[in-house]
């Protein structure tokens, strides 16, 4: 859940779609994929029915493999260090560069990114760090898992970003 420009409740995914469409990005593939997930109730089957780049498929597979471990400390670590602790700083740099382009149609995208920065940086990030500490406690094996899987999450995210960068 989130709020839009007029402070109305909305779905964060809808903010993403609106911001992408405003800058002229084609959102048909993501909409088709989400529709396939809903219809199939199985992400792997939905992937097979969708035109998704291998880099994105690999990233999704890694994500679902982590979920399949059913180990809360691993799932939380990957989420925290592969996303919550990382993305706000990245988005701040994107927002700064977009703000420097006069006349661009980036208001919706800026709003979407700023919402991420606010939610992830101010609220989710600090809470996630406390959660990891609580889940791992004094168990060195859990901390080792957290480090191992978080490092792999970063590698997977870099591979995805490298692909995205090559397509821009």
Language-model region placement:
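Non-heme di-metal
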Residues: 1-168
């Amino acid at each position: 859940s989130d709020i839009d420009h007029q402070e109305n409740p909305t779905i964060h995914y809808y903010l993403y779609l609106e911001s992408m469409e405003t800058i002229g990005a084609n959102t048909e593939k993501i909409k088709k994929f989400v529709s396939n997930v809903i219809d199939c109730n199985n992400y792997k089957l939905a992937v097979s029915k969708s035109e998704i780049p291998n880099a994105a498929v690999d990233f999704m597979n890694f994500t679902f493999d982590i979920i399949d471990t059913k180990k809360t400390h691993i799932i939380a670590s990957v989420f925290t260090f592969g996303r919550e602790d990382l993305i706000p700083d990245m988005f701040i740099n994107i927002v700064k560069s977009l703000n420097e382009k006069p006349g661009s149609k980036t208001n919706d995208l800026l709003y979407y990114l700023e919402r991420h920065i606010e939610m992830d940086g101010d609220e989710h990030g600090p809470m996630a760090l406390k959660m990891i500490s609580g889940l791992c406690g004094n168990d060195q094996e859990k901390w080792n898992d957290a480090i191992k899987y978080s490092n792999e999450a970063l590698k997977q995210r870099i591979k995805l970003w490298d692909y995205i960068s090559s397509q821009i």
